[in-house]
């Protein structure tokens, strides 16, 4: 039994193809709608699975080709994040057999596939499959790493992407002097479609590592949003996914920043001395930005692709507090009022300061001087 799956996002097609092949189906995939139509004519599948929203042509155009041009009754299943009633109605009027809204589970896709075309003769009915979720959007996550050989929680990362499709992790090795690069390359093995290792031979600091990673991931056409996250997972991937959900469901937001604001039910821990210094630094930051940010320094942020160049196009002045520079660049480019509408600060459910963090208390004091650098540099930029 042959299945053709058409979706412009490769991160959606990869787990879908893998699951259907595991079930015993013969599967071909295509990211371009026009080429998908050509493949339909040559492959002659028993089932077509297609997304509606694609850049070249709509998935409904694929349906029209099958039903109106080829006059074929080939079963068609639509997988889409589009919930527009008129679009769904048009799909069924054209003759689609099933419609599933993303996010959805591969288990359900498999069950509906069997209902539409039956099970392959070679299908192992006793086999149990993991319940991977196909997301509506595709997200790139940049994770800067410097000497993380002992601390990197490799299993936490792999477990998450194995269960949640639509994520592409980009680990940036920032000139580590230990075996971090070897650890990252081992992590990547077998998951090359979901994990990238970007190697910087020389240590340039976290700011430059994140910047290089963000610009690299911005070139990936199938990603909707791109963010960054600390390697120690002081903010975990589940909390990061909440930030993604916020930016996905609010068109006005271009940046959603995690915030370590202590609140009821949240697991937020900091050393008391570190907390006092953080409060002092935050007061200075609010004055520089003219914005009431509670926490700019949390290492968990998600961005719309259309603000990546403004935020990361130029090298940062400072090594650690580049987050402040990002927000300052946004306010200078869009204006303060517009920037306030674009930026969202979202409290985290969990944030724990991990042992072995590279930032010492002495370093924290140095940050005050770097804030002075930022204020001076971007005041000059504003005058130009």
Feature annotation, model-predicted:
Residues 86, 104-113:
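C-terminal output helix
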Residues 61, 83-98:
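Alpha4 helix (beta4-alpha4-beta5 surface) of REC/receiver domains from two-component response regulators
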Residues 24-31, 39:
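Short hydrophobic/Thr-rich beta-strand motif most characteristic of the beta2 strand and flanking loop
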Residues 198-216, 225, 237-316, 320, ...:
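Acceptor/aglycone-binding surface of glycosyltransferases and processive sugar-polymer synthases
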Residues 32-35, 58-62:
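Acidic catalytic/metal-coordinating carboxylates
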